[in-house]
């Protein structure tokens, strides 16, 4: 029995805390995807360094990469996820330690002194130490994968919020320019009406067009404020930090879209959430084996007993005194009697009513549940990768269609309508209808480009991990594009 215990202690060993708190694996896995610095803030110096870098990045015009880096340094939710990783490491180290023995001492006093000591050790915990340590190590590795997933998710949310905010700002800028033009035309119509050169109905059409553009601008400004607040939350910004500058427009479309070869295989092998699920499944398999092996014994304690007794006694002796007259002399001699006793005590549970079947069945069903969920996740990952790539390609084609076809045609139509109006070949109604259609087309073109960049983020997360935030349906940008 004791040989087995010593073997278990030797093989199990004791895990220790890593110097980086498990962050090296997180940094290594996310670095190849994000190309950004991933930092866990542990001290005031770390916090000061992170804030200094955030301040430097905020002093420049915001870019998508800078937004991601700021989020990785400044998002407290992400730091909380890294703290969860530290908790998992502490649990792993704790699971690798042998159980501490229980020591009890008892003392009785009377005619003597009686001392009793008892050392109780959980032998079952010692025998299963190595298995429990391996399970804890698997769960720590799963926690690392979850930290990778949290990092990728934070980066993806920052990119999405950035693209939405820039697109909203670009729409506001465009509508402000359109409003200035509409205001000038409205003032001109008013002056022409005062001279009688323009009928009142034509004046009203100019004025309502100006009012419509103003209403669109107000809604766009409201949306911009909302999108900037979402970006602030994603980046963890507040106070003066929110006074950053956004670029005037979204980036141009790439010359060619990314290929979609092997996206399903890449998703199944690369996604951090699937890796965490696989490691958790391994831990559950080991837990199931341990539960099955110990199903008959739930408690096994060994106690080392020792008792020390010291009693005060009196030795009595008698002697005969021969002197006349002869007398019997009684002699009392004080003495101490000391007794040492040693023993061993075994305590175990007799499985009269519970033969471990309930625990075994629970472990088995939990394991099978994890198997089915992992398979479901893998199937869903394949589908999500296909769906994300389809949306990516469709949004690219739609945004390119706006840039290459719709906007140039709208510009040509506007020029021809203006020439026809100046030559009195068309009326003001046709000119205003074309202006409305041109504004709509430009706004939709900006939204289509925004949807492409959002689809790019979704495609990346579908393959590498980080969750899905969803994008606007590509067809939404096309609605009404050909109208007018």
Residue ranges: model-predicted function:
Residues 1-70, 221-266, 312, 317, ...:
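Terminal intrinsically disordered/low-complexity segments used for targeting and assembly
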Residues 15, 145-268, 391, 395, ...:
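Periplasmic alpha-helical coiled-coil/stalk elements that build and connect Gram-negative outer-membrane
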Residues 73-80, 86-101, 117-135, 144-152, ...:
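A glycine-/polar-enriched beta->alpha junction
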Residues 116-118, 162, 264, 343-345, ...:
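Membrane-embedded beta-strand positions in outer-membrane beta-barrel channels/transporters
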Residues 199, 381, 388, 424-427:
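Alpha-helical heptad-repeat coiled-coil segments that mediate oligomerization/polymerization in large
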């Amino acid at each position: 029995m004791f040989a087995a215990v010593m073997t278990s202690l030797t093989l199990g060993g004791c895990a220790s805390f890593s110097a980086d708190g498990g962050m090296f694996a997180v940094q290594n896995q996310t670095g190849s995807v994000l190309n950004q610095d991933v930092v866990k803030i542990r001290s005031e110096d770390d916090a000061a360094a992170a804030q200094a870098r955030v301040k430097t990045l905020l002093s420049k015009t915001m870019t998508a990469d800078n937004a991601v880096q700021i989020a990785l340094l400044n998002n407290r939710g992400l730091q909380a996820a890294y703290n969860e990783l530290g908790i998992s490491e502490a649990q792993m180290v704790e699971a690798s330690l042998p159980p501490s023995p229980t020591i009890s001492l008892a003392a009785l006093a009377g005619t003597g002194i009686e001392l009793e000591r008892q050392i109780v050790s959980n032998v079952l915990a010692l025998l299963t130490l190595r298995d429990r340590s391996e399970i804890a190590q698997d769960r720590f590795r799963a926690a690392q994968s979850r930290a990778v997933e949290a990092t990728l998710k934070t980066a993806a949310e920052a990119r999405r919020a950035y693209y939405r905010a820039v697109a909203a700002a670009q729409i506001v800028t465009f509508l402000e320019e359109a409003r200035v033009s509409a205001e000038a035309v409205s003032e001109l119509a008013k002056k022409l009406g005062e001279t009688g050169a323009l009928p009142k109905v034509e004046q009203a059409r100019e004025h309502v067009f100006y009012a419509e553009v103003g209403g669109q601008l107000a809604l766009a400004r409201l949306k911009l404020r909302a999108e900037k607040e979402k970006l602030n939350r994603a980046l963890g910004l507040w106070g003066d930090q929110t006074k950053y500058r956004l670029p005037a427009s979204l980036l141009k479309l790439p010359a060619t879209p990314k290929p979609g070869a092997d996206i399903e295989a890449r998703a199944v092998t690369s996604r951090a959430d699937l890796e965490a699920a696989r490691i958790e499944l391994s831990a559950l398999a080991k837990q199931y084996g341990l539960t099955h092996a110990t199903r008959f014994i739930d408690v096994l304690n060994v106690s080392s007993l020792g008792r020390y007794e010291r009693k005060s006694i009196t030795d009595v002796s008698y002697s005969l005194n021969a002197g006349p007259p002869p007398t019997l002399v009684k002699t009392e001699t004080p003495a101490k009697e000391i007794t040492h006793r040693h023993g061993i005590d075994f305590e175990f549970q007799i499985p009269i009513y519970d033969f471990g079947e309930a625990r075994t069945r629970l472990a088995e069903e939990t394991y099978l549940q994890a198997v089915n969920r992992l398979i479901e996740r893998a199937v869903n990952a394949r589908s999500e990768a296909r769906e994300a790539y389809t949306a990516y390609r469709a949004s690219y084609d739609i945004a390119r269609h706006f840039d290459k076809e719709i906007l140039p045609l709208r510009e040509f139509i506007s020029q021809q309508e203006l020439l026809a109006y100046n030559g009195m070949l068309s009326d003001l109604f046709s000119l205003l209808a074309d202006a409305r259609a041109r504004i709509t087309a430009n706004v939709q073109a900006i939204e289509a480009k925004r949807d492409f960049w959002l689809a790019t983020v979704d495609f990346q997360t579908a393959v590498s991990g980080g969750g899905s935030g969803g994008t606007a349906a590509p067809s939404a940008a096309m609605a009404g594009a050909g109208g007018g």
